[in-house]
């Protein structure tokens, strides 16, 4: 049975694998003692959105028989009738049905390298939107190819090496002609990962004129650079582009649950190997905004169902740094920060779950699965400050191949109102609905947690992962945690009890479910058991509070991450719409598969503490509890 599950936070009234730590960014990017940022040219692009385009295009005539490339070409010609340009050979129709065509402006047969025009064609064959950075000044009258009054490309290479202090030896460099007008590859160099290249191009300068330059390409590992060296003076560098772009996000870092636990910091390149295209690319396109292979984040103040044209912060240099203050009001005044935080938390959780096995074949949320199994084209659509509700959040999980959708609401429980995106636990809780629904019953079936008890466990898994991730080095098994306390402006949170290993603080037992009739109440019982399980495994294996787990032979080497791994593996093992007993058994089976039951008795003791021990029985109206352990424990 196929289905879609919408889950909310509240009821409606010996190989060792280690992942790198996140890098906290400095204020100025400086590599090899050179500030590359100082060479960047200002932005020149203009963009006409779909609404404005619809009005403008009414006055233009296009043939219905044109293909999308021809239609786009006619638009460029009509917009710049006196300009010369070429079609870039990378046009395609995206998964949303929009055709994308790119053009490069030329002068005297040479590219103006930073003069581009992009046209987006809708499903109806009409221009959807477009943007351009075409040069509108005076083109030099003299063709440089006639007198060839420009410097040797070797001098340009040496100029780039000197200006940027590159580790490239170019004394013996010799140019070899390659495909393309005035294009060369340099032989006899050392220090670069591949042979440096150069080709002659024009470049728009900041003062509105064109400069004839050598575009020198050097791949030195940490940087893959395009250096625009003046073709008449090799000591002058006009612009530098680095293919190895570091993305930076100013956010509450991973592990900080909400603003009471710390301050926003700038974090650079936080992705792991789980995101080989980084967070701002899907392997096919790079996005200078909060969009990538794993997620697309935007605001949604109207609460509508569309998202692709909603607002997102834009940053061509991938520096997503925006102000936030606890006294700022309304939340829309800091929407850039909110969207960035939501994008960060969602991607960070994607990468962690990937390390535990929620990958392409398991039905995770990605556009491009890279031929690794599963169905792609299903990133998570995550809406910040969604206007369709307040004081809650939800996640819709269709089967694998269709995007999940998270809606994060503002909370009116405090003055000023609070944004749920800033409480990581709520985001993690919601995304976990996607995890559990894709794993339980298989990625193609999203209807395997729709019974009262199984749906309750769906809520409990969300609380468990949210709590496990926020643990701090100072915490012990006596540490208690709430759920949703900051957003709800209530230190007790939004659950009946705190998550605690103390039965006086949290008295929930397995038989408590007999009197509960709401999924979040039942979920609190399940999450309480998993919280006990986590601390039992931490006592057995030690705890680590690093952002990423360390594995040996596929087994997390600390109790906290081991508990997350076993619980997740259990989701994939259990039947469709399981009960507590079956889910407990699935976790035991997960440990058997992963560690050959090395933690069997530890797991049994944790569940037995709250009455889900050996001999506990399920009955919808009269569950039987047990504190017993099986033989051998």
Curated annotation (Swiss-Prot):
GO BP terms = proteolysis
- Annotated keywords: Glycoprotein, Hydrolase, Metal-binding, Metalloprotease, Protease, Secreted, Signal, Virulence, Zinc, Zymogen
Residues cleaved off as propeptide = 19-246
- The residues the record assigns to binding Zn(2+) are 429, 433
Q: Which cofactor does it need?
A: Zn(2+)
One term under GO cellular component: extracellular region
Q: Where is the signal peptide?
A: 1-18
Record: glycosylation sites: 410, 480, 622
Q: Which InterPro entries match?
A: FTP_domain, Fungal_virulence_M36, Peptidase_M36, Peptidase_M4/M1_CTD_sf
Instruction: Identify the enzyme class.
Output: hydrolase
Q: Please state the Enzyme Commission number of this protein.
A: 3.4.24.-
What does the induction field say?
Expression is strongly increased during growth on protein-rich medium. Expressed at even higher levels when keratin is present in the protein-rich medium.
Question: Where is this chain's protein located in or outside the cell?
Answer: Secreted
UniProt-recorded name of the protein:
Extracellular metalloproteinase 3
Q: What is the name of the gene encoding this protein?
A: MEP3
């Amino acid at each position: 049975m196929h289905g879609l599950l919408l889950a909310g936070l509240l009821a409606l009234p010996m190989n060792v694998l280690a992942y790198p730590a996140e890098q906290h960014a400095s204020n100025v990017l400086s590599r090899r003692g050179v500030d590359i940022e100082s060479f960047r040219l200002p932005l020149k692009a203009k963009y006409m959105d779909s609404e404005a385009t619809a009005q403008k295009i009414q006055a233009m005539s296009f043939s219905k028989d044109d293909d999308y490339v021809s239609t786009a070409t006619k638009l460029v010609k009509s917009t710049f009738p006196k300009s010369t340009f070429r079609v870039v050979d990378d046009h395609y129709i995206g998964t949303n049905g929009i055709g994308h065509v790119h053009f490069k402006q030329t002068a005297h047969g040479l590219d103006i390298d930073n003069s581009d025009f992009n046209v987006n064609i809708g499903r109806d064959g009409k221009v959807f939107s477009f943007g351009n950075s075409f040069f509108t000044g005076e083109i030099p009258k003299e063709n440089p190819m006639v007198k060839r009054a420009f410097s040797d490309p070797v001098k340009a290479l040496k100029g780039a090496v000197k200006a940027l202090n590159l580790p490239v030896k170019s004394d013996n460099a010799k140019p070899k002609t390659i495909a393309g007008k005035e294009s060369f590859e340099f032989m006899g160099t050392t220090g670069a990962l591949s042979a440096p290249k150069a080709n002659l191009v024009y470049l728009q300068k900041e003062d509105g004129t064109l400069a004839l330059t050598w575009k020198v390409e050097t791949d030195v590992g940490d940087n893959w650079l395009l250096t625009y060296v003046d073709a008449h003076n090799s000591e002058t560098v006009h612009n530098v582009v680095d293919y190895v772009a570091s993305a930076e996000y100013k956010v509450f870092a991973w592990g900080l649950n909400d603003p009471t636990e710390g301050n926003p910091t700038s974090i650079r390149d936080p992705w792991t190997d789980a995101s080989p295209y980084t967070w701002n690319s899907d392997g096919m396109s790079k996005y200078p905004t909060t969009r990538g292979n794993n997620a697309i984040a935007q605001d949604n103040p109207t609460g509508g169902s569309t998202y692709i044209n909603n607002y997102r912060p834009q940053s061509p240099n991938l520096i997503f740094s925006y102000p936030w203050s606890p006294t700022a009001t309304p939340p829309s005044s800091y929407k850039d920060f909110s969207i960035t935080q939501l994008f960060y938390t969602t991607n960070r959780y994607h990468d962690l779950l990937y390390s535990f096995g929620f990958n392409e074949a398991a039905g995770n949320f990605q556009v491009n699965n890279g031929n690794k199994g599963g169905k792609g084209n299903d990133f998570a659509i995550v809406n910040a400050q969604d206007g369709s509700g307040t004081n809650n959040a939800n996640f819709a999980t269709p089967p694998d191949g269709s995007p999940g959708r998270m809606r994060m609401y503002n909370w009116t429980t405090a003055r000023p109102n609070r944004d749920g995106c800033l409480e990581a636990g709520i985001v993690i809780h919601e995304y976990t609905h996607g995890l559990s629904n894709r794993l339980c019953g298989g990625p193609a079936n999203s209807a395997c947690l729709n019974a009262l008890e199984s749906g309750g466990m769906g809520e409990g898994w969300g609380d468990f992962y949210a709590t496990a991730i926020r643990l701090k080095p100072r915490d012990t098994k006596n540490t208690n945690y709430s759920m949703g306390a900051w957003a709800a402006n209530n230190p007790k949170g939004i659950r009946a009890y705190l998550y605690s290993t103390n039965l006086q603080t949290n008295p929930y037992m397995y038989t408590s479910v007999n009197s509960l009739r709401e999924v979040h109440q039942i979920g609190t019982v399940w999450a309480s058991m998993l919280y006990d399980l986590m601390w039992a495994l931490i006592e057995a294996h030690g705890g680590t509070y690093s952002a990423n787990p360390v594995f040996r032979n596929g087994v997390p080497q600390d109790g906290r991450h081991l508990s997350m791994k076993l619980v997740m593996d259990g989701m994939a093992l259990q039947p469709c719409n399981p009960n507590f007993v079956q889910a407990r058994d699935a976790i035991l089976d997960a440990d058997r598969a992963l560690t050959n039951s090395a933690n069997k008795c530890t797991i049994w003791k944790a569940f037995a503490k709250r009455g889900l021990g050996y001999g506990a029985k399920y009955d919808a109206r009269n569950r039987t509890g047990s504190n017993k352990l099986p033989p051998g424990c």
